[in-house]
């Protein structure tokens, strides 16, 4: 049943034409319209544009039925090349994540066809494995990982229904929707508070525009992410004014509290640490493990001031083939990264238009002196959700000083827009 479901989705993805006009600013009146928006100011631009414009450019949802196993969900993430999958169930039998009631309805009759009960990402799946990794400690064939063992009976762990891991990560606790007529400014408020993605109905049954909703019924939904909004900002840089030329330090866009792992940290321990801190990525730093006695969890509090060499993220976890999970989770982060890179180079995974073909991933960093425009360009071009802030010269070149996430980018752009708007009102009223 699941294979038929998955194949039907993949065929739909292959046949669907990706409409990129909304993300690249075409089809909205040309230069004269752009000039009008520029005169309206940054806040005016972000208030005028609606999330449905971006959502229409997105492909169909990647989803799995509530009966799918964790192995099915992991394969769907890999095949669809997405960070999260929605979980669908028959209507009337479930309470959605966070008490949500998001229903796909029949376009002709309005009758409910399916209920989206939550989202699951690879970190949710691997967290489930990590948390239950000590259940089989008495098994003589346990795989040693230096600080805890992945379960020997991985097949049993991966055969549980995907619905059982909804909400394992902080992001999965609630399933959000945005009304299609929500302005980008209001969307950015939601996305600047830690919400990474939300469902957007292309048509809504709700009369009143409420930016964030837990109840919705619509024939078609699309997934809108923080990256979609950042790409919009990149494509419309000329309309955003001076905020893009301001520095990371000036805008307060960086957080200096950074957790990190050593390259020799075991993957299973890194996953536990990421789950405990609600992180989807951590920097990997060049430091000997014996310099930090105890487990990796003691080390990760010492990230600032160490030389960052690469990133360990949910994307790496997603690209780990299910068949290799047992052996790869016991490897060090550095070994795991090498294995994933080799798997990508082999072209063993199917390609889809949402992301570019596999290529060696380079470190994506910035400094406190980098402009916001440079940060947005790097994030969008490299499809990364955070840039590590490093020192840029001398003996301290490459030392970790902080992190700028997409959440930070959207927060400071929104704050700049509202600040500019207040100044304009003060001038008019004076």
How should each PLM-predicted stretch be described?
Residues 1-430:
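Tandem CBS (Cystathionine beta-synthase) repeat/Bateman regulatory domains
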